[in-house]
Amino acid sequence: MPLPKLSRDEFAKSHALGNDYLVIDPKTLSWPLTPERIRLLCHRNLGLGSDGILTLEPGKDADFGLRILNPDGSEAEKSGNGLRIFCRFLHDHGYTDRTEFTVSTPGGKVSAKLDLAGGEVRLITVDMGKAEVGASDETAEVAGRKIRFVRVSVGNPHCVVIDPSLTREDLLNLGPRLETHPLFPNRTNVQCVTVVDGHTIRLLIWERGAGETMASGSSSCAAAAACLKRGLVESPVKAVMPGGDLGLIFLPDGMIRMTGPATPVYVGRLLL
């Protein structure tokens, strides 16, 4: 039996490989979801704590619509992990009984497919669209260092740094500086990438508006696309992150198909 749809001031919390989100239906809220309230709700000490908020919206030429709100109150164009969480939420809470449907985001419309086992969602596959990969490497001067990177868009911006020597300490130092670098007037997501073999990459992630995260679907797609374009990997690609692994397939037309889990945590009522 599905869980009930969200009622007045309720939310659902889920994570995808440790990347956690709150899911909210704005129509049920008794107060406006302002940037100030978003920052409070996402705060790990003063609020519920999350890497962002997903809101259920009317679909734009799609079955459902999704907005992705960052912990700093800004809005993201697309989130691979957020999409998987959102798609499972729709099925688990009875908004749809279909296993295939479409979702519109500010970064474009995506198609989703749910893999069920015993009536429960096991994995979610999302066609993330095509990646736009920079034709040549670029260089940014950051903290006295020249950092070579690949510029990628998968509906949202990414700065992919392919360098096996980079550590988590480097990510925490370079991530916020690259995110706000003048080369990225709208800010950017940052990935530090190591190519493990011809079908595997390992990445550390700094998300625009959120900071370090354990996993990111769109970052995985961007990093894999950059490595594929440079001839470092071939499809299929496994993206290994601190929170877990994602499977990526690059279709002949350039579409990126992402498959991974999403895990419900709890449902509650907002009092803040």
Predicted regions and their residues:
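A glycine-rich beta-to-alpha transition motif near the start of alpha/beta enzyme domains, typified by
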Residues: 1-120, 160-272
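Short secondary-structure junctions
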Residues: 8, 137-139, 146-149, 258
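Ser/Thr- (and often Asn-) enriched beta-sheet segments in non-cytosolic proteins
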Residues: 102, 111-113, 139-141, 146-148
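Short, solvent-exposed secondary-structure boundary/capping segments
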Residues: 120-128
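Ligand-binding beta-strand-loop-alpha-helix segment within the catalytic cores
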Residues: 130-132
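Glycine-rich, charged/polar anion/phosphate-binding loops
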Residues: 134-136, 144-148, 177-179, 189
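Extended Gly/Ser/Thr-rich low-complexity repeat segments
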Residues: 137-144, 267-272
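Internal active-site segments that recognize and position negatively charged phosphoryl groups
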Residues: 141-168
